[in-house]
Amino acid sequence: TMAEHNELGKWGEEQAALYLRSKGWYIRHRDWHCGHRDVDIVAIDEDSSIVIFVEVKTRSTGQWGEPDEAIDLEKQNSIIQTAGSYIRNFRLEYCEVRYDTISIVGTPATGAQITHKENAFDLASRFFYREHVRYRRRKRPGNW
């Protein structure tokens, strides 16, 4: 059900936050909203030089592949834009910025299997994709 799905997601974010703390990250915000966009976890390292924006995806089983495969280009774009608002809002322009994903497979009963991908995507990969799409559109006007 949707309620169970949301509960699993909340549990997954909790596991991700605990994991990041254990690695020495300080959790600044969880579920930070800007308009209709949001970012699951914003964390910063101990000397405040790197800020990470983390998208967490949780699935009860791994049978459909890695949970973070669900983070499509549109979602990546949304996270990058939200991060920009966050950085301006909290005056973090001096920080290095990184976009990470954390995939969680499991349930409260089975425990969490955690996969943390650092630098999972960035602005450069987004720009490359946009150029690629524009090129394809010019080549095949009939199909769009």
Residue positions per predicted region:
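Acidic-basic catalytic patches of nuclease active cores, encompassing PD-(D/E)XK
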Residues: 1-31, 110
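Residues at secondary-structure transition points
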Residues: 3, 7, 11, 36, ...
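Conserved catalytic cores of phosphodiester-cleaving nucleases, focusing on short active-site segments
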Residues: 20, 39-43, 48-62, 79
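Short strand-connecting beta-turns/loops that link adjacent beta-strands
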Residues: 35, 46-48, 109-110
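Catalytic cores of nucleic-acid endonucleases
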Residues: 58-108
